[in-house]
Amino acid sequence: MTKEDWEAVIGLEVHAQVSSNTKLFSSSSTEFGAEHNTQVSLVDAAMPGTLPILNYYCIEQAIRTGLALSAEINKYSYFDRKNYFYPDLPQGYQITQFFEPIVKNGRVFINDNEKEIRIARIHLEQDAGKSVHEESKTYVDLNRAGVALMEIVSEPDLRSSAEAAECMKKLRQILRYIGSCDGDMEKGSLRCDANVSVRLKGSSTFGTRCEIKNLNSIRYIVQAIDYEIQRQIEILESGEEISQDTLLFDVASGKTKVMRSKEDASDYRYFPEPDLLPVEVSQDKIDLIQSSLPELPDQKKLRYIEELGINEYDANVITSDKAIADYFEELIKKHDSKLAVTWLTVELFGRLNKAGIDIVSSPIKANALSELLDFIVDGTISAKLGKQVFDSMFETGKPASLIIEEQGLKQITDRGQISEVIDKIINNNQDKVQEYKSGKTKLYGFFVGEVMKLTKGKASPDVVNSILSERLSN
């Protein structure tokens, strides 16, 4: 048998940190990068006698996420205790939602909306702390302990690492659009576990799955899944059986390694959390959250294509990130969409890519670019000079109006002034005038170039063409 005879079956468990200033069951800050153990309440440290108090904002964000994924909202849900021991879990259990999650039966589309990936559930849970290893000692940092996570669990509908990566990107895109998670994988705000198994193509029976934990970049998701698929195929083709294990991905070697044998639900002894009341959500509350949802990326993309006439490629690029889409929306408040697309995707993106920064860090904000386009559209400067001004704006952060004034770039539109320049050029180049009139029309560009040279590029192209055509036709 060859690799082509096998089929991968993949499901994702995506852990998305709720964009909340405080934790799920305490008022401790969730700010990233604080000193170790400076954002820990008595509840987070599991001091005896302390009780959790639910941060209802996190419930609203989970509902918001569920609605964005076309899911069902459970009007009655509750929390459970997941019992296990780990040094950075001070309670000895994690408060999660096992029996009745807040959200179920959603979906997300990938492959240009051609494939539906079912979302089994979204539940809220608290994050654990972090073990910090230094030489022969290990320290525990509880700053993350109790931070609210949404666990978004997909059905095993993915069939390749590429599909898993696209699903992760699509979920991140939606989460950022609705504001329930910032999607920053570098800071740990978004990570996932991948459940991977293989089976012969055509089979409807699931193979033994292994879970790869804590994948925190799209690249690692692809590498880990690809390696694991190949590993399992080689084991099965050698006549051995897959062991149901929990794995870690070693970035240095590019291989998965066994962390522990995979647990079943019974190993965690789930039972309802006795210190928290069930969560009841009214239909009115659900409707209110639904009405507050912004235009989602697929809806926005369709609008750009159908209403603004933008091609599918550019629409994909612009809607890929909410910050880019917001920037574009600001531009088209005053300007033609095609002009905005060109300046955004060609001029701005070109400079951002060269500088290695994203649009959020751009030295040219949307209102500043819009002002520059005002000057180009009203003829104050030419499009060519506009690019020169744009470069200066990018380098200095100065507004277009100031740069135009400082560099004396205001376009010459006075017909009398331009006529004098053109007459001078024609008088000094009678031989070329005769050649032009005898059929060498390509010389027209020579005359335009001479006008621009003498006016230092400031002459209005429209006025130049109008007068020059008239002079050369006489």
Curated annotation (Swiss-Prot):
Q: Name one GO molecular function term.
A: ATP binding
**Is Protein biosynthesis among the key words of this record?**
yes
BP GO terms, sorted: glutaminyl-tRNAGln biosynthesis via transamidation; translation
Keywords assigned: ATP-binding, Ligase, Nucleotide-binding, Protein biosynthesis
Report the top EC class in one word: ligase
InterPro entries, alphabetized: Asn/Gln-tRNA_amidoTrfase_suB/E, Asn/Gln-tRNA_Trfase_suB/E_cat, Asn/Gln_amidotransferase, Asn/Gln_tRNA_amidoTrase-B-like, GatB, GatB_C_1, GatB_Yqey_C_2, Gln-tRNA_amidoTrfase_suB_CS
SMART domains in the cross-refs: GatB_Yqey
- Reaction catalysed by this enzyme: L-glutamyl-tRNA(Gln) + L-glutamine + ATP + H2O = L-glutaminyl-tRNA(Gln) + L-glutamate + ADP + phosphate + H(+); L-aspartyl-tRNA(Asn) + L-glutamine + ATP + H2O = L-asparaginyl-tRNA(Asn) + L-glutamate + ADP + phosphate + 2 H(+)
Q: Which Pfam families match?
A: GatB_N, GatB_Yqey
Q: Does the keyword Cell cycle apply?
A: no
Known EC number: 6.3.5.-
Quaternary structure (record)? Heterotrimer of A, B and C subunits.
Q: What does this protein do?
A: Allows the formation of correctly charged Asn-tRNA(Asn) or Gln-tRNA(Gln) through the transamidation of misacylated Asp-tRNA(Asn) or Glu-tRNA(Gln) in organisms which lack either or both of asparaginyl-tRNA or glutaminyl-tRNA synthetases. The reaction takes place in the presence of glutamine and ATP through an activated phospho-Asp-tRNA(Asn) or phospho-Glu-tRNA(Gln).
NCBIfam families registered for this protein in UniProt: gatB, PRK05477.1-2, PRK05477.1-4, PRK05477.1-5
Q: What family is reported?
A: Belongs to the GatB/GatE family. GatB subfamily.
Name of the featured protein:
Aspartyl/glutamyl-tRNA(Asn/Gln) amidotransferase subunit B
